[in-house]
């Protein structure tokens, strides 16, 4: 019985850690790097925070598609263009990048630190 408990604990730890790791093939960039990309025309800037968070404060040029709606609204994005994802801390945008990757998107970039690191 003790072995089963340890196996369960180890599996839970692995799943938890895996949830926080960036998806393979997703670029991680700083807020400094994204400031240069905001001016480019061939990128899609997506803020995955809630509509209320976005309404209270957002970066010009970013479109709001909340994480909870990314699967339903992914058709609004062009798979051929780079998708740059932003949230408050980088956690939700990381999850969004994993969801979009599963949906076949390959040009994905996550903003490390999100809005919290924006200056």
Q: Which residue stretches match the model-derived regions?
A:
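Flexible, polar/low-complexity N-terminal or interdomain linker segments that lie immediately upstream
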Residues: 1-44, 48-55
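Small-side-chain structural scaffolding
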Residues: 34, 43, 48, 62, ...
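Conserved beta-strand scaffold positions in the cores of enzyme catalytic domains, especially
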Residues: 28, 45, 62-64, 108-110
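Residues at the C-termini of beta-strands that transition into short coil/loop
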Residues: 32, 49, 66-68, 112
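Extracytoplasmic/periplasmic/luminal assembly and interaction segments
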Residues: 52-86
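Conserved functional loop/turn residues at catalytic and ligand-binding sites
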Residues: 42, 58, 66, 90-91, ...
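Catalytic cysteine-centered active loop of the rhodanese-like fold, especially the PTP/DSP P-loop
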Residues: 71, 77-119
């Amino acid at each position: 019985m003790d072995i089963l408990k340890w196996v369960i604990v180890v599996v839970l730890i692995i799943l938890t850690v895996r949830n926080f790791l960036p998806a393979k093939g997703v670029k991680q960039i700083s807020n400094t790097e994204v400031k240069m990309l905001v001016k480019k025309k061939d990128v899609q800037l997506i803020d995955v925070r809630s509509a209320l968070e976005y309404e209270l404060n957002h970066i010009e040029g970013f479109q709001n598609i909340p994480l909870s709606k990314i699967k339903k609204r992914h058709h609004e994005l062009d798979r051929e263009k780079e998708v740059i994802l932003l949230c408050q801390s980088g956690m939700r945008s990381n999850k969004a990048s994993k969801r979009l990757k599963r949906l076949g998107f390959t040009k994905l970039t996550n903003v490390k630190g999100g809005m919290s690191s924006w200056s």
